Amino acid sequence: MTSAQWFLLIGALLLVRGLTATLLERSPVTSAIVYLGVGLLVGPSALNLFHFNPLKESALLEALTEVAVLISLFSAGVKMPGTFTFARWRAPVLLATASMALTVGLVAAFAVWVLDLPLGAGILLGAILAPTDPVLATDVQIRHPGDRDQLRFTLTCEAGMNDGSAFPFVMLGLGLLGLHNLGDWGTRWVVVEVLWATVGAIAIGVVAGIALARLGWMLRRGPKHHVLLDDFLGLGLIGVVYGLCVMVDAWGFLAVFFAAVALRQTEQKLARTALPHAEPGSLPLVSEGSLVFKEHLERLSEMVLVILLGGTLFLNSWSWGAVGLSLFLFLVARPVSVMLGTWGSGTPLRIRGLAAWFGVRGVGSLYYLMYAIQHGLPEPLALQLIQLTLIVVTMSILVHGTSVKPLLALFWRRS
C-alpha cells in the first residue's frame, strides 16, 4: 500500500469510528474486532494489499507496542478509585503473581509436551501469553475515576501489574535458551530480575507519582496560581519513570502503573484534606487533566496495532497447534490459574469466574515477543513463536471481543 492509501484507510477508519461511537457502544462486539476485520481484509488473508512482517520489523513493532502499553498502563493507573486498602487489592495482586506464575507453568507444560518446544522456549511462550492486556481490554476495565465496580477494578489492577510481573519469566526463558545470564543456580535472576527489578520499580513509580502530585498541587494553589499543561506532565512522568527504570534495571511497566496510581491517590488525598466539601471533579488535577488525552492515544494505538496484526496473517497461519494452544489457554490455563491463585482471597465466586474468562491477550504479548526477538532469539524458533502468538492474540480478540459485552450485561443485571 502507498502512503496515500494508508492515509485514506486510517482517515476513513477514524471518521467512521468517531461517527459511530454510540452505535459501536451498543453493539455486542468490540472495536478491536472491527479493526482486525479491516486488517484481515487488506492483508494477505484476503486482498493482499500489504503484508507486515513481524520478524523483519521486530524493532519497529517492539517500539510501537512498548509505547502503547505504557500509555494504557498510565491511563489504567490514574483511574484507580478510592483509597488504597490491602483487602481491595488482595485479589489483583494474587492474579498478577500467583495466577501469573501458574499460567506460565501450564502454558510451558503444554508447549513442551504437546508442541515439542524446549523448556526455555516453553517458559518464554508462557511469559509472552500469560499477561492480560491493558490496551485491548478496555471494555472490561474501569471506565472513569469514579467507577466502583469490583470486577472492573480487579481486572484493571491485574492488567496494570502483570505486564511487569511477567518480565522475570521472560528473562528466565531467555536465560534457559542461553540468551541471558541467570547467574550461578539462578541467583542473579532471583536477586536482580525478581526482587530488585520489582521492588525498585514500585518504589520509583510511587515516589515519582507522589512528587509530581505534590508539586502540581503546590504550584496550582500558590500565590501566582500557575497554569499547568496536564497532558505534558502525564507524558513527562511516563518518560522519566520508564527511562530511570531502564537505567537501573527495574521493570518500567510496573513503575509507570504505580506512578499513575500514586499520582491519583496523592492528589485525591490532598484535595480531601484541603477542601473536604469540594465536589468530585471540580478541582483541576494532573491525573484527571491528562487522562482524556491518554485515552485518545490509547484508542489510536489500538487501531493501528490491530490492523497491523491482521496484516501479518496468512490463511495457512492457522495451524492445529496454534488453535489448540489458544483453547488450552482460554479454557484450561487461565481458569485454573485464576481459581487456584485467588483461593481464600475473599473475592466472590462470580467475580472470580468472570475474571477467569476475561483474560484478554493482545499488545502486551506482542511486545514481549518482539523483545525476545530483539534479544537474539534464533530465527526458526522466533518464527514458531510468532505464529503461535499471533493466532492466540487473534483468537482472543475474536472470542473475548464477542463475549465480553453480553457477559458483562448479564453480570450487572444479576448484581
Task: Explain the meaning of each model-derived region.
Residues M1-S415:
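Transmembrane helical cores of multi-pass secondary ion antiporters/exchangers
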